């Protein structure tokens, strides 16, 4: 991977100076030795799983050093470089990627702290401020991550990504969003598992799913019931295959009662994970909706509920650990 990085650099960078492989940081060797020692302590050296784990670690470090080599040669040639995310990039990686081609010296290169983790597939690309990389839009990425953070009540997502605990919060929310939407802004299509699921889906539910999709939530309708015996006994399932139950707040005068009933019914469904309320057709304020959802979610011990407000904005209310009422759970409130 390191030699390939040099070859690639010389091929695609015009008038590039002679490239060289970047020095291996001392902490890399130490980290590898510690990893091997930890593996050997847990099993025999000839165990295939142990050898596979060691091989995977070596492959990962080789890939990462390819990135270090690209950075090293970019600086030697007076170029900038950017960190281009792919796959399941974490919030911290996305924060680095959203800066674009800003790194151009050993000082600025130190800003990313050499951050790499297991299964990180971010790629370092050398270039300049005007360079365009297919599928890489740092400004768009920053906008979407700002939107994602705002749905959690976080004002500055880049600062949050540098905070250990808030990074975990962002990463959990990233797991709920479609990766193509996160990385390149492509809105996922609303889909149906089969013809029956499409037939059973109500028009207002499909419209609600379309609104969710605009915020990067992948919506696939499933048949919302399951036969459990020969007598034809049915049990309910969530509207969407990812465990989301769709509920509307339209035409309700008693907000608390509607939410209470909706969460009660939703939680009983097999595979239920969260509930989304559509408030686009209501006159309730975000604060009123938040308070009602928070109150009922605590009582029902449901740790994730979301809603779409009158303006089409998406809000997530997370009650960490779904603690019992009166235990002051951590709540992320909408603005």
Pin down the residues of each PLM region.
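Structured core elements
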Residues: 92-94, 121-123, 243-245
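Domain-core detector
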Residues: 1-117, 127-181
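A short, glycine/Asx- and small/polar-enriched loop/turn
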Residues: 233-238
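A short beta-turn/loop motif at secondary-structure boundaries
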Residues: 84-86, 227-232
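C-terminal edge-of-domain segments
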Residues: 115-127, 315, 319
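Conserved catalytic cores of phosphodiester-cleaving nucleases, focusing on short active-site segments
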Residues: 240-250
């Amino acid at each position: 991977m390191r030699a390939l990085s040099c070859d690639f650099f010389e091929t695609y960078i015009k008038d590039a100076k002679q490239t060289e492989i970047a020095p291996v940081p001392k902490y890399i060797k130490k980290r590898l030795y510690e990893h091997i020692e930890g593996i050997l302590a847990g099993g025999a050296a000839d165990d295939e799983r142990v050898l596979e784990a060691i091989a995977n670690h070596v492959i990962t470090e080789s890939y990462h050093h390819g990135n270090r080599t690209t950075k090293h040669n970019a600086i030697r040639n007076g170029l900038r470089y950017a960190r281009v995310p792919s796959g399941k990039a974490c919030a911290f990686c996305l924060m680095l990627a959203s800066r674009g081609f800003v790194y151009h010296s050993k000082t600025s290169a130190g800003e990313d702290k050499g951050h790499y983790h297991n299964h990180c597939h971010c790629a370092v690309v050398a270039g300049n401020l005007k360079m365009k990389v297919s599928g890489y839009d740092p400004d768009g990425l920053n906008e979407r991550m700002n939107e994602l953070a705002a749905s959690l009540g976080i004002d500055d997502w880049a600062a949050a990504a540098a905070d250990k605990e808030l990074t975990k919060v962002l990463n959990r929310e990233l797991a709920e969003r479609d990766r193509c939407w996160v990385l390149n802004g492509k809105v996922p299509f609303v889909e149906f598992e089969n013809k029956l699921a499409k037939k059973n889906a109500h028009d207002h539910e499909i419209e609600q799913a379309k609104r969710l999709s605009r915020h990067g939530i992948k919506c696939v309708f499933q048949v919302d019931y399951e036969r459990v015996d020969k007598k034809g006994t049915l049990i309910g399932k969530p509207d969407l295959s990812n465990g989301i139950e769709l509920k509307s707040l339209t035409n309700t005068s008693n907000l608390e009662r509607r939410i209470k009933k909706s969460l009660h019914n939703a939680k009983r469904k097999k595979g239920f994970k969260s509930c989304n309320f559509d408030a686009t057709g209501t006159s309730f304020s975000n604060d009123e909706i938040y308070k009602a959802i928070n109150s009922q979610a605590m009582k029902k011990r449901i740790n994730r509920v979301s809603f779409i407000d009158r303006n089409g904005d998406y809000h997530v209310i997370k009650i960490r650990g779904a603690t019992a009422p009166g235990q002051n759970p951590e709540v992320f409130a909408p603005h």
